[in-house]
Amino acid sequence: MVFLTAQLWLRNRVTDRYFRIQEVLKHARHFRGRKNRCYRLAVRTVIRAFVKCTKARYLKKKNMRTLWINRITAASQEHGLKYPALIGNLVKCQVELNRKVLADLAIYEPKTFKSLAALASRRRHEGFAAALGDGKEPEGIFSRVVQYH
């Protein structure tokens, strides 16, 4: 490639500016009013939207955890247990299910959740040895209870 003049050798900065503006306006297309047409307004709005998007990722996690806890609380109260008692006694019985799985079990598998609540209730009232009973677990649940002989 041969450049005959110095002007052809230098970069054309106008096209860079054009594509930079179009990139911002592309993100602002769905905004209402002048914010999707005027570059100066679009830049502010797009930056603000990106900041809110970043914060919303953490809020979503927090809101989902609150939702799971509310669902587990409601389901455990149907079986006569409070939420802290249910979670604490399931941990003591070495049932390693997180809140998301417990909330899903409470909604879609109520019999399984009922047996988990029964296990936690027995552990609460009688202790770990009584929770194991005769060495069998309640029907319909799987846990990682280690039995020592």
From Swiss-Prot:
Presequence range in chain numbering: 1-9
InterPro entries from the UniProt entry: Ribosomal_bL20, Ribosomal_protein_bL20_C
GO cellular component: mitochondrial inner membrane; mitochondrial large ribosomal subunit; mitochondrial ribosome; mitochondrion
Assigned keywords, A-Z: Mitochondrion, Ribonucleoprotein, Ribosomal protein, Transit peptide
Molecular-function annotations in GO: RNA binding; rRNA binding; structural constituent of ribosome
Primary location: mitochondrion
Subcellular location: Mitochondrion
Highest taxon of source: Eukaryota
Subunit text: Component of the mitochondrial large ribosomal subunit (mt-LSU). Mature mammalian 55S mitochondrial ribosomes consist of a small (28S) and a large (39S) subunit. The 28S small subunit contains a 12S ribosomal RNA (12S mt-rRNA) and 30 different proteins. The 39S large subunit contains a 16S rRNA (16S mt-rRNA), a copy of mitochondrial valine transfer RNA (mt-tRNA(Val)), which plays an integral structural role, and 52 different proteins. Interacts with OXA1L.
Protein name, as recorded: Large ribosomal subunit protein bL20m
Species annotation: Homo sapiens
Gene coding for it: MRPL20
